[in-house]
């Protein structure tokens, strides 16, 4: 009964536009959430690898192993560390390089005191 006046066509267009707007909003929210989860996972993996690298390098220093560098492959990435002497005899400077399997790289510098057995500085 309203077809002759053209009421149904504008209503269909309005409802279609509304549905597309809602679908667009939901898709944008989903993509944003997925990207956040991926970036958060990369952050936590990088932090974990850095902490493992610090523990490995400190163990290397305390056990007085030969050589001034080391590398360890983990399930989610790789850790490399280089140990340098500082002007203070008891302190060692350690450079860490971490790369995850997805390609993210992070670096950190720490200063470790052998006498007190504690970290003096951590810089990323």
UniProtKB/Swiss-Prot annotation:
Gene Ontology cellular component list: extracellular region; plasma membrane
Q: What is its main location?
A: membrane
> InterPro entries of this UniProt entry?
Competence_ComGG
Give the record's GO biological process terms. Answer: establishment of competence for transformation
Q: Which residues form the signal peptide?
A: 1-28
Compartment(s) of residence: Cell membrane; Secreted
Q: Which domain of life is it from?
A: Bacteria
PTM note says: Partial processing of ComGG in competent cells requires ComC.
In UniProt terms, what function does this protein have? Required for formation of the type IV-like pilus (T4P) that plays a role in transformation. Transformation pili are dynamically extended and retracted, perhaps thereby promoting DNA uptake and transformation. Required for transformation and DNA binding.
Name of this protein: Competence protein ComGG
User: What is the protein's species of origin?
Assistant: Bacillus subtilis (strain 168)
From which lineage does this chain's organism come? Answer: Bacteria, Bacillati, Bacillota, Bacilli, Bacillales
Query: What gene is this protein a product of?
Result: comGG
């Amino acid at each position: 009964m309203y077809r002759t006046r053209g009421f149904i066509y504008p209503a269909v267009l309005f409802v279609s536009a509304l549905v597309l707007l809602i679908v667009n909003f939901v898709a944008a929210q989903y993509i944003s959430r997925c990207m956040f989860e991926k970036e958060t996972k990369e952050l936590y993996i990088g932090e974990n690898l850095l902490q493992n690298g610090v523990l490995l390098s400190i163990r290397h220093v305390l056990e007085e192993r030969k050589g001034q560098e080391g590398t360890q492959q983990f399930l989610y990435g790789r850790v490399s560390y280089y140990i340098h002497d500082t002007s203070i005899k008891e302190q060692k400077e350690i450079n860490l390089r971490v790369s995850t399997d997805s390609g993210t790289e992070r670096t950190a510098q720490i200063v470790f005191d052998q006498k007190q057995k504690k970290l003096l500085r951590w810089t990323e």
